[in-house]
Amino acid sequence: AFVSTDLQVNKPLRMKKLREYHEVLIGGSRYIELKGRKISLEELSTYPWISLTSEALTRKFLNNYFADHGLQFLPDMELATTDLILPAVRHNLGIGFVPEEFAEEEKKAENVFEIEVEEKLPTRNIILIYDTEYPQSIASKEFQKFLSSQKN
C-alpha cells in the first residue's frame, strides 16, 4: 500500500519512505486579498475551506496541524479525492491545500495563487507499506522507480 502519513506497522509489515512532498494553500480570484502576504491560520480559519472527508489520512493530518496551533479545522466543503480540490478552488468555492505539483500549472495560468501561511505546514512523505513475507508486485516496483525518478 502507498500512504502519505507515517503509520505504526508490525512485522511482517515494513515501511519505506519513497519521496517527500509539500502541500500548498491555494485560492482563486475571489480571495485575491490573501495574495502576497503571510497570513495566520487563525485569520485563514474565517474563510471557507475545501478539504477531503474526515476519514482521509490527509484530512487527519490537517486536523492535527490546526490542533497543534490551537484551532479546529472545519471545512465548508468535503470532497472524496485530492484532485477535486483544485477545480473547486479555481471556481472560488473556498481555499484548500493541495500537493505543490498539483497546483503548478494552474498557478502558471494564474487561475489560482498560492497563499503564504505563517505557520509552516510540515513536509509529508509518500510511504510504501509492504509485507516482507510476500514478493512485491511488478506494478509496485515500477511505481517505486517512477517516484524515485521524480524531483523532490
Region spans (language model):
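Hydrophobic hinge/microswitch elements
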Residues: F61-I115
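Alpha-helix capping/helix-boundary segments
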Residues: Q8-V9, Y31, T58, L84, ...
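Acidic, Gly/Pro-rich loop/turn segments at junctions of secondary structure
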Residues: A1-Y47, S54, L121
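A late-sequence structural motif
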Residues: F2, I115-N152
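Residues embedded in well-ordered beta-strands
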Residues: K17, V24-I26, R30, I95, ...
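Secondary-structure junction motif
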Residues: E33-K35, P48-H69, Q136-S140, Q144
